[in-house]
């Protein structure tokens, strides 16, 4: 079975490598492509847009689906794109996925009840994105890098990108009941970029007939949004990904070879 692993905003395939390596070792065919504008220059990243990322995810999934059912996995932005692809499949625009693995996938950047926000600016994100489309931010500190390695455009935060994603989220939330593929949700309990509320919301509103929700606890104060590379959770996250892949691959084979009534 093929597995499509979609990385997060501003990041790179590096963040999906622990899962890709574990899935490959378990006998699966893992693909972790770079989204448009990622993995290159800052100019290319800033010139990219959510519509490009969505089109790329759809095209890559369609390409891989030519060889049979695909496990669709995504982290953060990649999880949002995976949900969008799964909804397109539910509408008949794409082949149905074997399963859906959502890693630290935000469905809300902020809420008033329960009260939380990725950043205080996100309460007025459309305005801030117009006034200050790109923020220059400090580098990650050495402790964070050691605990949860990450590669990407860490010195810039493109509010325009986040505003584009936020505009897409209401339609994605409305489409969750369409999804029927088995679902596995993984994130860290202390994630302040993607609060656990998002995981519970996805579990409650997704139409999947089989759902697994895993909130992993870590002691470190660093790297809370990176369950795949965090030194305290990466092995467990990889194990969960492999177990879920085996589960959905087995279900796919059972459906394929089940006797048909005449």
State what each model feature region is.
Residues 158-176, 181:
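Active-site nucleophile elbow and catalytic-triad environment of alpha/beta-hydrolase enzymes
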Residues 179, 185-187, 191:
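Short beta-strand/loop motif that positions the catalytic acidic residue
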Residues 74-78, 82:
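Gly/Ala-rich beta-loop-alpha elbow adjacent to hydrolase catalytic centers
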Residues 41-65:
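Catalytic nucleophile-loop/oxyanion-hole region of alpha/beta-hydrolase
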Residues 101-112:
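Active-site nucleophile loop of the alpha/beta-hydrolase fold
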Residues 218-236:
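Catalytic histidine-centered segment of alpha/beta-hydrolase-like enzymes
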Residues 192-198:
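Conserved alpha/beta-hydrolase "acid-adjacent" motif
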Residues 1-41:
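Short, surface-exposed "cap/lid" segments of acyl-processing enzymes
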